[in-house]
UniProtKB/Swiss-Prot annotation:
A zinc finger (AN1-type) spans 143-189. Residues 80-94 have a biased composition (Low complexity). It comes from Homo sapiens (Human). GO terms for biological process: apoptotic process; cellular response to tumor necrosis factor; negative regulation of apoptotic process; protein targeting to peroxisome; protein transport; regulation of canonical NF-kappaB signal transduction. PROSITE patterns: ZF_A20 (PS51036), ZF_AN1 (PS51039). This is AN1-type zinc finger protein 6.
């Protein structure tokens, strides 16, 4: 019995390598690549292409002739190119002189910069050695808070009463008439009233 084999058509990819499936009707290309191919052909037909085949045929038809006389000519050409590539001694001397001049300029600039930095360091050290008045004031010890009664020398701590005369008193001697306070309450009150209640005077009548 004859065995029948069903050959299923395997889908092939586009011949341009775009990743889509191609069609044998469009020369193995997808529809997009086939349209681009047709557009390129139409545009190339409008332009005059150079006869590349004729050039290649002429190059193949002409044999390369190499004679003994052509070898020395090539050797002389190589010698001339090598001699042109070698640097001239004049150019080397000029480069050396320029490098020496640049190094001298750098050394002089460094020498100028060194004394400037020394002056700056000296000024900074002078200012650091002279303490300012504010620092000296801040270093002073703060005054100890009085914690004893000025009259009976009883230790009051936080329960003491500070009077306007500047002393601290206990609960018994806190009144001004008890400890003979030197603060003038009357003058202070009169000054306060004078500031809060200024005298209002009307304008003088100008005679015609």
């Amino acid at each position: 019995m004859a065995q029948e084999t069903n050959h299923s058509q395997v889908p092939m990819l586009c011949s341009t390598g775009c990743g889509f499936y191609g069609n044998p009707r469009t020369n193995g290309m997808c529809s997009v690549c086939y349209k681009e191919h047709l557009q390129r052909q139409n545009s190339s037909n409008g332009r005059i292409s150079p006869p590349a085949t004729s050039v290649s045929s002429l190059s193949e038809s002409l044999p390369v002739q190499c004679t003994d006389g052509s070898v020395p000519e090539a050797q002389s050409a190589l010698d001339s190119t090598s001699s042109s590539m070698q640097p001239s001694p004049v150019s080397n001397q000029s480069l050396l002189s320029e490098s020496v001049a640049s190094s001298q300029l750098d050394s002089t600039s460094v020498d100028k910069a060194v004394p400037e930095t020394e002056d700056v360091q000296a000024s900074v050290s002078d200012t650091a050695q002279q303490p300012s008045e504010e620092q000296s004031k801040s270093l002073e010890k703060p005054k100890q808070k009085k914690n004893r009664c000025f009259m009976c020398r009883k230790k009051v701590g936080l329960t003491g009463f500070e009077c306007r005369c500047g002393n601290v008193y206990c609960g018994v001697h806190r009144y001004s008439d008890v400890h003979n306070c030197s603060y003038n309450y009357k003058a202070d009150a009169a000054e306060k009233i004078r500031k809060e209640n200024p005298v209002v005077v009307g304008e003088k009548i100008q005679k015609i």
